[in-house]
């Protein structure tokens, strides 16, 4: 089974719409990266219904640790930096998108995170 994980910073106190927008940015950018490096995972994910899971971290440090570990594992990913036009400071890191990839590969990095 394939999935995509989106990890959102919960400490920024973004509104629901802002969080949704950041999750969408992370999802799309990670998908585009996956198309370049793992087309078989993208095909599998598309055929299985595009499962997504949205998780949370409580700091920029935690978000960067996840991003580092995702890169160590060689998974397709994205790191989202907000432009700062609405609710949060310009340049704030808001989200990481991971995959699509096999669930067991993603869970190696995300297994300790809680659902948003």
From Swiss-Prot:
It is found in: Cytoplasm. It catalyses: an N-acyl-L-alpha-aminoacyl-tRNA + H2O = an N-acyl-L-amino acid + a tRNA + H(+). GO terms for molecular function: peptidyl-tRNA hydrolase activity. InterPro entries: Pep_tRNA_hydro_II_dom_sf, Pept_tRNA_hydro_arch, PTH2. Keywords: Cytoplasm, Hydrolase. The keyword Calcium does not apply. Its main location: cytoplasm. One of its GO terms (biological process) is translation. It comes from the Archaea. CDD domains: PTH2 (cd02430). Its EC number is 3.1.1.29. One of its GO terms (cellular component) is cytosol. The natural substrate for this enzyme may be peptidyl-tRNAs which drop off the ribosome during protein synthesis. Belongs to the PTH2 family. This is Peptidyl-tRNA hydrolase. It comes from Methanococcus maripaludis (strain C6 / ATCC BAA-1332). The lineage of its organism: Archaea, Methanobacteriati, Methanobacteriota, Methanomada group, Methanococci.
């Amino acid at each position: 089974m394939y999935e995509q994980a989106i990890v959102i910073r919960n400490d920024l106190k973004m509104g629901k719409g802002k969080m949704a927008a950041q999750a969408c940015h992370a999802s799309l950018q990670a998908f585009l990266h996956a198309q370049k490096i793992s087309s078989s995972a993208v095909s599998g994910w598309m055929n299985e219904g595009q499962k997504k899971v949205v998780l949370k971290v409580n700091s920029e440090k935690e978000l960067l640790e996840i991003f580092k570990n995702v890169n160590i594992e060689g998974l397709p990913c994205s790191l989202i930096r907000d432009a700062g036009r609405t609710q949060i400071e310009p340049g704030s890191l808001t989200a990481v998108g991971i995959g699509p990839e096999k669930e067991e590969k993603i869970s190696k990095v995300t297994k300790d995170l809680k659902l948003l």
